Swiss-Prot record:
It is found in: Cytoplasm. Belongs to the SRP19 family. One of its GO terms (biological process) is SRP-dependent cotranslational protein targeting to membrane. Involved in targeting and insertion of nascent membrane proteins into the cytoplasmic membrane. Binds directly to 7S RNA and mediates binding of the 54 kDa subunit of the SRP. InterPro entries: Signal_recog_particle_SRP19, SRP19-like_sf, SRP19_arc-type. One of its GO terms (cellular component) is signal recognition particle. It comes from Pyrococcus abyssi (strain GE5 / Orsay). This is Signal recognition particle 19 kDa protein. Keywords: Cytoplasm, Ribonucleoprotein, RNA-binding, Signal recognition particle. Its main location: cytoplasm. GO terms for molecular function: 7S RNA binding.
Length: 99
């Protein structure tokens, strides 16, 4: 099992890769909240170790306040970080469709 940090900005479709988006834009979601990421991770069976709602990804310190998303979550997953992020992004899209 791998432990790693997931920043909300890594899943945000509004951001370029320069500012921290990791997943492809077609899989990313607009303005993902830390609560959505946590819910998706738990529903997928990943262990959530820590949630920090006020943290800002250092890559976002130089951009407009409108584009900043706060929060990071530390999880444990059997997959690598890139695959885990893609799975979580797909789950968030699914959860949003249900609402």
């Amino acid at each position: 099992m791998s432990k790693f940090v997931i920043w909300t900005s890594e899943l945000d479709s509004r951001l370029s890769k320069k500012y921290g988006r990791v997943v492809p834009r077609n899989l990313a979601v607009e303005r993902p909240s830390i609560e959505e990421i946590e819910e998706a991770a738990k529903s997928l069976g990943f262990k959530v170790l820590q949630v920090e709602r006020e943290k800002l990804n250092p890559k976002l310190s130089g951009i407009d306040e409108d584009l900043r998303t706060y929060g990071r979550i530390i999880i444990e997953s059997p997959y690598g970080k890139a695959k885990t992020l893609k799975i979580i992004a797909q789950k968030i899209r699914e959860l949003r469709r249900r609402r």
